[in-house]
């Protein structure tokens, strides 16, 4: 309800997210205060950047926010776009350690395999930057409720094909 109020009325300071009071923070590790603040911010803003320093637990903060929004029924499917090198080591491992009750899949391999995974019933689907271009139509049709772009600097130039593809997906004009 408070999140809905924040979207309806523009307050000078946003109302506190219920995540800080009404969430159990699952996982092997309990969040630090700054991770709770980050999760609160992300759960209140439908479009947001997270510029926390390296090593501050941004991935877990994102996962807790997504899990909280899933618990509320506000989102169902999350697409994580990240470098190939951290699909397993960071994202899938952190999902297991933070939200072990959620399902996840690595979307990598042939176009056919990627399509099958994208069409699957997973809470979190993890794909690398270049994989997005291979199955952009299927990604659009999958109707992800939340898209997380890790290390968004890979999309900083509007002249690259990566940026153009993700822009089409996000602006509902993918053909």
Q: What feature does the model see in each segment?
A:
Residues 52:
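The Walker A (P-loop) glycine that initiates the GxxxxGKT/S ATP-binding motif of P-loop NTPases
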């Amino acid at each position: 309800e408070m999140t809905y109020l924040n979207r309806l009325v523009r307050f000078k300071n946003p109302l506190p997210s219920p995540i800080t009071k009404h969430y159990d923070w699952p996982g092997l590790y309990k969040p630090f205060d700054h991770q709770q603040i980050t999760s609160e911010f992300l759960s209140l803003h439908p479009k947001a950047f997270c510029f926390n320093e390296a090593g501050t637990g941004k991935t877990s903060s994102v996962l807790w926010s997504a899990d909280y929004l899933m618990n509320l029924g506000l989102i169902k499917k999350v697409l994580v776009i990240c470098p190939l090198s951290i699909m397993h080591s960071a994202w899938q491992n952190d999902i297991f350690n933070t939200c072990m009750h959620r399902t996840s899949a690595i979307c990598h391999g042939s176009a056919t395999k990627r399509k099958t995974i994208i069409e699957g019933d997973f809470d979190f689907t993890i794909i690398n930057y270049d994989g997005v271009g291979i199955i952009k139509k299927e990604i659009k049709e999958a109707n992800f409720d939340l898209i997380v772009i890790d290390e968004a600097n890979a999309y900083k130039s509007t002249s690259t094909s990566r940026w153009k593809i993700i822009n089409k997906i996000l602006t509902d004009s993918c053909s």
